[in-house]
């Protein structure tokens, strides 16, 4: 197979687009801010097919299961994994902030902070309780779930639809085959849309730099550096240890999904790479049923980057305003963050809303303290999204191995940079 010229490789194009976007945003901010529709348009094109792809992937995966108990088993294992790893992420964020103390020295009087700029985030945070979140998973109508692009609602519909098809067996084969064919068409659309990723990344990055400016980063560089460093440590050490235990290299895995990571970096939304990630995981030997269940669920329940960010941001505000938190208050913070993070999704800005929800339950720290990081949240959003997508990818491989449905030959070939791999029997064990 003839190797592509480097300038035709997608990730090279995305890197170039990001660099050009940064340059335009820095030197011509007024023009750069007008590039926002390019980024928004690309994300909308991807989100256009996310719902149908999740539905089709989950339905065909479940319909092919001989044992319906497996659906509950996979879901239970995934949720258990999510909670354990999320706890590690929260604790790591807490420990890093205590160790590096990025907020010490600001000496800000909370009374001088104007909370008007974050009022809208606070309102959204107060607008949904745990019960509301759970009830929101149930759609008003099937059409409404797809129209609004609600991932968890679509997942619920797909679980029910797939379960019925599995029960019908051969009588439902025509419907199953149709949905399987539709899945191929949808992924074909994704391949076409993905070619526009450099344009989307350019527009989003140009807008970000043009609107907020590189200068807005300077006063809070220590916080940004602490967050990025902690996220890298989490990926290399925590996820790296999990990957090694499962039998693969985290470095090679990150390299395998580099195109998806660059799309996320450019757009600051992990949803922008969801369909491509699902397809890559299947090609890497994960079973379709596990991919279909774990990845969409992980986008609400396994946001490792958001978890690190939340504990770090809360402690930063406390340090900057000279507020001492007791260990009991910090444990309460962890418990609250564990719950509020479940309401976040892969959309840009969701992390800031969940931060507002967390602060609202910890009254010791003023909600107005969020204005301290409002200007740099957009720059931290990229790191949150990158960590989230790596975390969900690793989770899918782990649960597949746990279920003895990981084709390790495919995984090895994929991580070595191999092309299409012939199917082999799935290997057992972790």
Swiss-Prot record:
| Xref: Pfam families | SDF
The protein's name: C4-dicarboxylate transport protein
- Originating species: Burkholderia orbicola (strain MC0-3)
Topological relation to the membrane, as annotated: Multi-pass membrane protein
Annotated compartments: Cell inner membrane
Q: Which UniProt keywords apply?
A: Cell inner membrane, Cell membrane, Membrane, Symport, Transmembrane, Transmembrane helix, Transport
Name the gene that codes for it: dctA
Q: Which PROSITE patterns match?
A: NA_DICARBOXYL_SYMP_1, NA_DICARBOXYL_SYMP_2
The record's listing under Gene3D superfamilies reads: Sodium:dicarboxylate symporter
According to the record, the segments passing through the membrane are 9-29, 45-65, 79-99, 149-169, 185-205, 223-243, 308-328, 356-376
Name the domain of life.
Answer: Bacteria
């Amino acid at each position: 197979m003839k190797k592509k010229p480097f300038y035709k490789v997608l990730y090279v194009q995305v890197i170039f687009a990001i660099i050009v976007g940064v340059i335009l945003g820095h030197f011509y901010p007024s023009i750069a801010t007008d590039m926002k529709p390019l980024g928004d348009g690309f994300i909308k094109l991807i989100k256009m097919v996310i719902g149908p792809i999740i539905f089709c992937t989950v339905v065909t995966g479940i319909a092919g299961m001989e044992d319906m108990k497996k659906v509950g088993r996979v879901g239970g294992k995934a949720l258990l994994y999510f909670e354990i790893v999320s706890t590690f992420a929260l604790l790591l964020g807490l420990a890093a902030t205590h160790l590096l103390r990025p907020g010490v020295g600001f000496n800000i009087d909370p009374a001088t902070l104007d909370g008007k700029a974050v009022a809208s985030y606070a309102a959204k945070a107060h607008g949904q309780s745990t019960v509301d979140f759970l009830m929101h998973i149930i759609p008003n109508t099937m059409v409404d779930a797809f129209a609004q692009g609600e991932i968890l609602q679509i997942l619920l519909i797909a679980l029910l639809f797939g379960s019925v098809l599995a029960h019908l067996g051969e009588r439902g084969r025509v419907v199953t085959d149709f949905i399987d064919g539709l899945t191929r068409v949808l992924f074909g659309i994704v391949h076409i849309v993905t070619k526009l990723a450099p344009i989307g990344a350019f527009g989003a990055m140009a807008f970000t730099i043009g609107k907020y400016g590189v200068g807005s980063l300077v006063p809070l560089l220590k916080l940004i550096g602490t967050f990025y460093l902690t996220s890298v440590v989490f990926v290399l050490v925590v996820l790296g240890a999990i990957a090694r235990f499962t039998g693969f290299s985290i470095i090679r895995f990150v390299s395998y999904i580099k195109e998806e990571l660059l799309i996320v970096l450019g757009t600051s939304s992990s949803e922008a790479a969801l369909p491509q990630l699902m397809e890559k995981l299947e090609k890497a030997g994960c079973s379709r049923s596990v991919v279909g269940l774990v990845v969409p669920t992980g986008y609400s329940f396994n946001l490792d980057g958001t978890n690190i960010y939340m504990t770090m941001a809360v402690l930063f505000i406390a340090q900057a305003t000279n507020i001492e938190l007791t260990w009991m208050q910090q444990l309460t913070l962890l418990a609250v963050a564990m719950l509020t993070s479940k309401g976040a999704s892969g959309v840009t800005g969701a992390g800031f809303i969940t931060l507002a929800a967390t602060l609202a339950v910890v009254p010791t720290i003023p909600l107005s303290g969020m204005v301290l990081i409002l200007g740099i949240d957009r720059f931290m959003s990229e790191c949150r999204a990158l960590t989230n997508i790596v975390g969900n990818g690793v989770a899918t491989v782990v649960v597949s191995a746990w279920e003895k449905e990981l084709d390790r030959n495919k995984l090895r070939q994929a991580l070595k940079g191999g092309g299409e791999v012939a199917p082999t029997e799935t290997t057992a064990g972790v």
